[in-house]
C-alpha cells in the first residue's frame, strides 16, 4: 500500500497498490461471485435529479447487509474485511476516533454506457477503489471533480479518499461490447457519523 497525501487541486489521499497480490486476487474472485447479484440504481441509494430521475446508470450492491444471505454462516465478505486497512489510513491522517464512525460498503459495476452524474455523498469521507481486469477493454469511466476540472483514471487497484461534500461524477464508460466483468468495478466505502 503506497499512501500519498495530496493537496492539489483539493485535499485527498491517493493509494496505489491498495491491495497486496493475494488480497487483490481475493477481491477479484469475490467480484466475480457478486456480479450476478448486482442491482439497478433504485437499490443503491442513487442521487436523483430534480425530476426524480436517477443520476447514475450502473449496477451495485451494498455488502454490509444485502450480501449476508449469500455468505456462508460466519463468513464475512473479504471486501468488508479489508476495509479496515483503508479506515486506518483516514484515522491516521486525520486523527479521527474510529468508534465515532459507521462504514458502508458499496460495490458498483460500470459497463458500456454507464455513468454517474455530478453529485455529493451524504457522509464525511468517500473512498473509491478502482478494480478493472483489463483497461484495454473500455475507455472513459474517470472519476471527475467538476469544481476543479480534475479527474483520476480508473486504474486497477488505485484508491482515492476525498471529502464527501466534493462534487464528483463517473464519466461515461465506452466499450465496443459490454463484456461482463470487463468494465469497471468500484468499491466505495462511505464514512458516516
Regions found by a protein language model. Name each.
Residues 1-94:
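Non-heme Fe(II)/2-oxoglutarate
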Residues 84-193:
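Catalytic core of non-heme Fe(II) oxygenases with the double-stranded beta-helix
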Amino acid at each position: 500500500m503506497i499512501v500519498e497525501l495530496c493537496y492539489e487541486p483539493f485535499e485527498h489521499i491517493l493509494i496505489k497498490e491498495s491491495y497486496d497480490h493475494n488480497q487483490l486476487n481475493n477481491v477479484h474472485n469475490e467480484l466475480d461471485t457478486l456480479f450476478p447479484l448486482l442491482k439497478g440504481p433504485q437499490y443503491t441509494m442513487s442521487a436523483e435529479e430534480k425530476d426524480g430521475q436517477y443520476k447514475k446508470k450502473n449496477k451495485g450492491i451494498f455488502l454490509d447487509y444485502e450480501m449476508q444471505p449469500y455468505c456462508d454462516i460466519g463468513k464475512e465478505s473479504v471486501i468488508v474485511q479489508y476495509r479496515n486497512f483503508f479506515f486506518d489510513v483516514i484515522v491516521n491522517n486525520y486523527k479521527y476516533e474510529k468508534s465515532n464512525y459507521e462504514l458502508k460498503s458499496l460495490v458498483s459495476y460500470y459497463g458500456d454506457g454507464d455513468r454517474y452524474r455530478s453529485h455529493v455523498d451524504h457522509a464525511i469521507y468517500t473512498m473509491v477503489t478502482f478494480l478493472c481486469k483489463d483497461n484495454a477493454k473500455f475507455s472513459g469511466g474517470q472519476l471527475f471533480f467538476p469544481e476543479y476540472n480534475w479527474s483520476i483514471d480508473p486504474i486497477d487497484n488505485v484508491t482515492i479518499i476525498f471529502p464527501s461534500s466534493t462534487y464528483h461524477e463517473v464519466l461515461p464508460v465506452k466499450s465496443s461490447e459490454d463484456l461482463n466483468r470487463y468494465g469497471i468495478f468500484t468499491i466505495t466505502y462511505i464514512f458516516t457519523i
